[in-house]
């Protein structure tokens, strides 16, 4: 086991987050921040961030991102970032892995933090697809690990059980993996493993053979009774000449009531999501939409941010609801993310190219970060607001191959709700000629304050 020690990271300071004044009308979104992360040492591109907020302390933020050490993507590490003052100052930890990607963080019930990444395991084989788990018991100041959950993984994510169910406090790790079925053929499977001891160890994983199609799992969530919900999407079939893309990609939901040992049949959520990782969120509030599931994704050609919701634990889903109402006649949107705060307010953020000018090869355009919220359980959305104060353009010399690989800052970005109901955003932004992290905080005034 290795312990990683800190080097200081400071943000360019901005005025602290202010609450909405008493005369602000319901439905107003207040943006504070757009603060650039500034680090000592070599200036390297940082991309694909993920963010977690301590459910017991909104000033305690933990993030992770990919650090690109060579612009041709041949060398990449990951780093974690921790803040104890609401994101004004941060401390950075470099994992110092020989190869790293897909970072994801989660804070447990007792404050234990888990970080998962894909990478090469130190002292083991040279495979770059180990699912590696790091653990911090001191709020993110130091890290122990990694332990490997095996090879052949992609897009691993974490969920924490904060329910009143029998598995409260558990961490769930989900990923797409490969396994050999009884016929001897290797299939794409959904992989789920549970830890009941704060990430020190994991139960034998469940590997789900769902079809003969290529699939990717997405981020799981846990309902108020402890039911685990795992989304996945299938997108291609195997042929003698390689993978053949399906005409329509499909999004599915699986549920488990026994801690991830067994699962329901796949329940269809959408056939409208194309060319992106979807994101799942659940309403944790005690309000009228408690346990409502929200699925966010992009449509074909990156034209729309689409939201679907289910009020019956994933059995039935609404038709897609367009979120980006103000994107114009030639919309371009990417990397949407969704979360729900303590009051049941649904927050959605995405990269938007409405002001980006001419496109290069259809998919490469300058973008800005936009945010909106729903106060009625996803039926309607407030007018979206621009969060970033400048455009981010991916195709820049200092970004190198990174702009081609991640034209919108990564396959995902960080969006989380604080215990007092605000939303915190963390994204990769190349306004400074290469991808660097930026953060902002948003308050949605969901009711008139007295």
Indicate where each model-derived feature is located.
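Bacterial N-terminal signal peptides
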Residues: 5-16
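Extracellular, repeat-based ectodomains that mediate carbohydrate processing or recognition
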Residues: 19-450
């Amino acid at each position: 086991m290795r312990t990683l020690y800190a080097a200081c990271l400071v943000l360019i300071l901005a005025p602290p987050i202010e609450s909405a004044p008493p005369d602000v009308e319901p439905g107003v979104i207040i943006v504070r921040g757009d603060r650039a992360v500034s680090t000592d040492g070599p200036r390297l591109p940082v991309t694909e961030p993920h963010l977690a907020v301590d459910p017991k302390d909104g000033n305690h933020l933990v993030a992770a991102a990919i650090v690109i050490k060579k612009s041709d993507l041949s060398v990449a590490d990951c780093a974690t970032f921790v803040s104890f003052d609401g994101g004004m100052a941060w401390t950075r930890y470099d994992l110092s892995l020989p190869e790293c990607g897909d970072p994801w963080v989660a804070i447990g019930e007792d404050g234990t933090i888990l970080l998962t990444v894909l990478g090469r395991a130190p002292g083991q084989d040279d495979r770059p697809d180990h699912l590696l788990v790091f653990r911090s018991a001191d709020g993110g100041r130091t890290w122990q690990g990694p332990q490997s959950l095996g090879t052949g993984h992609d897009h691993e994510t974490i969920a924490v059980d904060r329910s009143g169910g029998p598995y409260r406090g558990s961490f769930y790790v989900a990923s797409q993996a490969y396994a050999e079925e009884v016929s001897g053929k290797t299939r794409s499977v959904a992989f789920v493993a549970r830890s009941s001891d704060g990430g020190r160890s994991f139960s034998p994983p469940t590997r789900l053979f769902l079809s003969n199609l290529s699939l990717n799992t997405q981020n799981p969530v846990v309902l108020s009774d402890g039911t685990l919900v795992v989304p996945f999407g299938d997108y291609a079939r195997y042929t003698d000449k390689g993978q053949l893309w399906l005409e329509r990609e499909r999004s599915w939901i699986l549920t488990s009531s026994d801690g991830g040992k067994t699962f329901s049949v796949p329940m269809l959520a959408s056939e409208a999501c194309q060319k992106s990782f979807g994101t799942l969120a659940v309403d944790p509030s005690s309000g009228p939409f408690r346990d409502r599931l929200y699925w966010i994704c992009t449509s074909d050609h990156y034209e729309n941010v689409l939201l679907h919701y289910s009020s019956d634990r994933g059995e039935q889903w609404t038709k897609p609801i367009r979120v980006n109402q103000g994107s114009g006649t030639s919309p371009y949107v990417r990397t949407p993310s969704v979360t729900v705060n303590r009051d049941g307010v649904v927050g959605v953020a995405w990269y938007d190219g409405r002001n980006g000018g001419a496109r290069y090869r259809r998919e490469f355009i300058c973008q800005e970060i936009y945010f909106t919220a729903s106060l009625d359980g996803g039926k309607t959305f407030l007018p979206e607001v621009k969060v970033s104060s400048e455009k981010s353009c991916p195709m820049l010399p200092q970004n190198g191959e990174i702009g081609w690989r991640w034209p919108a800052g990564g396959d995902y970005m960080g969006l989380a709700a604080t215990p007092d109901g605000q939303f915190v955003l963390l994204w990769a932004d190349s306004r400074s000629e290469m991808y660097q992290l930026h953060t902002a905080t948003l308050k949605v005034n969901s009711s008139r304050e007295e």
